């Protein structure tokens, strides 16, 4: 398909976009044949091809003579997309192969951010004062900034959930908030795990790019790092809010639990004399007034007097 001077070729797992000598290839769970063909065309090192076939547990950046290889993990805001089922993925990995005139992205599941970026892709963003050398780098810059923008949307949503939880905590819905806060904590942990190594990877990329692109690209990477710092600050703010809210919720739950235990204890203390009287008059032995026709009324009066006395004591001691 051709539109806006962009040639788009799509197969089952591969989407290729060509624009004025720049190529973007997006591979989703690529087959061995697709990887081999792409690696041959762009002279991708066999070590990188091997890494593209499987997911990695850590982010990293490697500089080769013809390209830069970069791995970044991005969190999935499950509370935003409603994917809280057990076993659902909590992060997504994107492998970037950045050449001077090509960008290859590889991932192992559909990624919303890449689909959105591809749908709204504007080739005019790649025009850098007529400099062709940094076009692939500029494409990477715009793509990563878009991905970070998606994370900002997710963090804004989490912030809204925390505000909603705050209102419910102070509306006597503390128990219902325990599960919600646990879900929020899970998402914040996923964000933190995925993003904690981005800064050092981006710093390494900034150093490597000086040898690969011209100095102008250094400015764009600085903007990417600034965007990352903004996302990390949002994450830390949400985390601090969550910690304070969780402590408040736990305190209110503890107060309510203590109040409930206090009521049960007072009730047990109040009724203890009644139990003692009935147990005493139930013993198999001769008791005062046992043969009196008024013994029942005597015991009843004693029990009522004991109950009244304990109620007065509880009120005086402010147990009730």
Question: What positions do the PLM features span?
Answer:
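Hydrophobic alpha-helical transmembrane segments and their immediately adjacent juxtamembrane loops
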Residues: 43, 226-320
